[in-house]
Amino acid sequence: MRPSGRAADALRPITLTRQYTRHAEGSVLSAFGDTKVLCTASVLAKVPPHKKGSGEGWVTAEYGMLPRATHTRSDREAARGKQTGRTQEIQRLIGRAMRSVFDLAALGEYTIHLDCDVLQADGGTRTAAITGAFVAAHDAVSAMLRDGQIKASPIRDFVAAVSVGMVNGVPVLDLDYAEDSNCDTDMNVVMTGSGGFVEVQGTAEGTPFSRADLDAMTRLAEAGIAELVRHQKQALGL
């Protein structure tokens, strides 16, 4: 029995609340159980230097945790004067995930800048961030179409992410903190709505995992992401 009482192949309760804040072109509160991430998407009429004059746009992300998102307070990274390696890794992952489903040429020389701020952490913050950020980006694109900034949507597919792992020899889906901190294997999987893999990050924390374990975790992730994409479509009214 999992600490949450869920079946091995069950996601936590998922909610994707759109228009959560007022000013951003897209804003979503992404909740995976007790993990809550605010994802905002801002449209900027500029591109980074390596895209200037190319006719192409860019999609990028920043990620951070509020000081009391976890059990004990942590200092703001701005107060420390530098980002941790973990923060840099996660925000690059979010950016790569979004760009995997964007036609940057169709975006034109605009940037969609995603900010993912963890309000409360209970495992799976990066996967909640990716899943919510896509919905926020979709709303930002809708705003660009409405305002005449672009003529056609640059979004080619959906993208979502979920964690899987081996806990006491059993493959499980969407780990919360209690499981994540005691698992044998921790893996994050990013996939498109059409079933393509964008990223697979997996590490054995203790006992090495077998090819059969890997296949079982991958199958769990595929099913979980298909369900998350259904949540995204439902949130967007598609």
From Swiss-Prot:
Alphabetic keyword roster: Nucleotidyltransferase, RNA-binding, rRNA processing, Transferase, tRNA processing, tRNA-binding
Record EC number: 2.7.7.56
GO BP terms: rRNA catabolic process; rRNA processing; tRNA processing
EC top class, as a word: transferase
InterPro entries found in the cross-reference section: ExoRNase_PH_dom1, ExoRNase_PH_dom2, ExoRNase_PH_dom2_sf, PNPase/RNase_PH_dom_sf, Ribosomal_Su5_D2-typ_SF, RNase_PH, RNase_PH_bac-type, RNase_PH_CS
Pfam families with a match to the protein in the record: RNase_PH (PF01138), RNase_PH_C (PF03725)
Binding locations of phosphate: R86, G124, T125, R126
GO molecular function: 3'-5'-RNA exonuclease activity; tRNA binding; tRNA nucleotidyltransferase activity
Gene3D superfamilies: GHMP Kinase, N-terminal domain
Chemical reaction(s) catalysed: tRNA(n+1) + phosphate = tRNA(n) + a ribonucleoside 5'-diphosphate
SUPFAM superfamilies assigned to the protein according to its UniProt record, in alphabetical order: Ribonuclease PH domain 2-like (SSF55666), Ribosomal protein S5 domain 2-like (SSF54211)
Family, as annotated: Belongs to the RNase PH family.
Subunit structure: Homohexameric ring arranged as a trimer of dimers.
Role according to the record: Phosphorolytic 3'-5' exoribonuclease that plays an important role in tRNA 3'-end maturation. Removes nucleotide residues following the 3'-CCA terminus of tRNAs; can also add nucleotides to the ends of RNA molecules by using nucleoside diphosphates as substrates, but this may not be physiologically important. Probably plays a role in initiation of 16S rRNA degradation (leading to ribosome degradation) during starvation.
HAMAP family listed in its UniProt record: RNase_PH
Protein name (record): Ribonuclease PH
Gene name for this UniProt entry: rph
